[in-house]
């Protein structure tokens, strides 16, 4: 009996010691550790087992700061949309390890910049790409989006109506009006006016989802917002274009809607159906789709830059850069602060996501529509917008990814003034 008591006492002591070690590395568990490690002195074997240490699951102490900032635990169901896979991933880290699309997305700004330099330096590199190639190229980009979607993902929109509505209104109301005001304020030449306004009326850019990921924003919201704005662009973009620039240049809204239907809705729907009913096909094509999307983006950017090189490098072309830069900076700022209004007051990740989705639009679609319906010179603003949008958007996302906010930008450049105010 004494041996049993001694063994039980030894086992209890070792168990308590183990619990003490497990909780020592976690400061938030000190009170529980003291409670478990210091039971009252037992008088019998039954009393020794009176307060058996509770086994704590290892996941209780697991923390993932990098995942928590992005909001993966709350949006685990849509996390796989970051990749070109056919189904959900077990963890974001494993998705990043086996998914080439994220690495290619990180290289996209460099590819865009290299495309611009090549098109302006040696126009023959892209001048062979005629407007007949634009629709297939953009269709390849849209197909790469469609295979990332599933029918269940759109059900999330009904569960999150407020942030989705804010982002959608900023995309199709605030941004087009802002584009018209900026174009008129800078006295934009008529050769670029209609194309610039059209660029402000298209759907969100696919790159905004990656920018939301870098900025530790709401990735699921970004993908839903981009998908909804892309699908509805079949109707909304022709209507906005006719209202805002119909008095400047003639716009065939019905023909534009048919073109968007062919190059946007059909490829996206095809990809959605493949991902839903033919996952084996998606598993075959998904490794090459990131490369296809990047190649198509490069063609859609380089062609209008190469064809209109003389106009871009002219005095009028240089005057075009300032309005485009102003527009994108204003769109990022307005998209952020409109989400901070007292009656809308959204969380920081949502504000960042709406900001990048407002400041980044599908300029490749605008370039296609401008080339088909407005003339090749009107595609120049869209091509320039792609370059500026990618550089500014991913720079801002990287800044936010370091844990900083827009309101902290001033203190980064004027640290002494910030220190004086804080003291």
From Swiss-Prot:
Membrane topology: Multi-pass membrane protein
InterPro entries cross-referenced by the UniProt entry: BilAc:Na_symport/Acr3, Bilac:Na_transpt, Na+/solute_symporter_sf
The organelle targeting sequence, given as a residue range: 1-45
One protein family per Pfam: SBF
A GO CC annotation given for this chain: membrane
Keywords: Chloroplast, Membrane, Plastid, Transit peptide, Transmembrane, Transmembrane helix, Transport
Residues passing through the membrane, by range: 106-126, 138-158, 165-187, 192-214, 231-251, 254-274, 287-307, 318-338, 380-400
Intracellular or extracellular location(s): Membrane; Plastid, Chloroplast envelope
Membership in a protein family: Belongs to the bile acid:sodium symporter (BASS) (TC 2.A.28) family.
Function summary: May function as sodium-coupled metabolite transporter across the chloroplast envelope.
Annotated protein name in UniProt: Probable sodium/metabolite cotransporter BASS3, chloroplastic
